[in-house]
């Protein structure tokens, strides 16, 4: 397990997490160890996303950088947007979706790292996007005062809803039965079946990050030191606790056996990990913390076990964000992908090709040996028949 965080200082931090198996309860303590610091971009980092293999970062320098966490190397960079990258979301291990200030939403093949489709999503900037747990839908908000629903199977707009103000965050619930739209310090809760607001929660300060801890409990952080847990059904605050000395910039939550963890990053430079209680009315206990001495902007958690990152759908049922026809139409455009290690990538490609050829050759050689064996057997039978005739 590894925490990754970006900052204004253009650096990507990586911290290895070491849980203490013997400790338990409120006295449980985990350890964070600095693993790497990488000068990732030429401007401040604005977004980060993780899957089971890669970490991707977006920046004000308009590029998306890819890092292979297994090999601990930079894998390359994606260049397509002409504005700050505002949001990055993986769906499984096959697709990455990016949004930026240029109003575009791009769907990327996370294997070949090609742009499958580029959609002019908003008249203004794309400020945030969220993918439905099924992978079939996505929501986006922008500076054109619209909330847009996207059909990812067909790669087209499904529904446009005008809202009174510019929203800056949108988030699906774990089961995808509801979603929240954030405008400044206001949280509007929408039901999927009616597409209407079922309730509104007001936070004290402008909201910077929200995370669903369950289908009805929402963690909210903003331009203050406090994190609050709200019940989306009753619209009441279940609990609040002081998490940092400065405003909280981002949060991330995940579950591993016997632990439900929320991670917070703040402008004070600290990253903290908290163990959630079953009763969300009780504040979580601090597992560990580390000071980066940087102004943090975005946060992610890379779980090194594939089992920890399994999607709710099996691979066979996992829907593709773009149809086959559109993937043919949306071929890789020149300049979409810029690999820093082009010379290295070519031999790798050849190596993959050679590996494929060698498997094919092995299969063919197996077929040839079978034919030879049959021919030998036939010749042997003919020879025996001739021998019998000669004896007669």
Curated annotation (Swiss-Prot):
Keyword Nucleotide-binding: no
Residues that bear Phosphoserine: 320
Molecular function terms from GO: protein kinase inhibitor activity
Keywords: Nucleus, Phosphoprotein, Repeat, Ribosome biogenesis, Signal transduction inhibitor, WD repeat
Feature: compositional bias, Basic residues: 381-392
Tissue spec. comment: Expressed in brain, colon, heart, kidney, liver, lung, muscle, peripheral blood leukocytes, placenta, small intestine, spleen and thymus.
One cellular-component annotation, GO: nucleolus
GO biological process: cell population proliferation; maturation of LSU-rRNA from tricistronic rRNA transcript (SSU-rRNA, 5.8S rRNA, LSU-rRNA); negative regulation of signal transduction; regulation of signal transduction by p53 class mediator; ribosomal large subunit biogenesis; roof of mouth development
Protein function: Negatively regulates the PAK1 kinase. PAK1 is a member of the PAK kinase family, which has been shown to play a positive role in the regulation of signaling pathways involving MAPK8 and RELA. PAK1 exists as an inactive homodimer, which is activated by binding of small GTPases such as CDC42 to an N-terminal regulatory domain. PAK1IP1 also binds to the N-terminus of PAK1, and inhibits the specific activation of PAK1 by CDC42. May be involved in ribosomal large subunit assembly.
Record note on quaternary structure: Interacts with PAK1.
Protein name from the UniProt record: p21-activated protein kinase-interacting protein 1
Lineage of the species this protein comes from: Eukaryota, Metazoa, Chordata, Craniata, Vertebrata
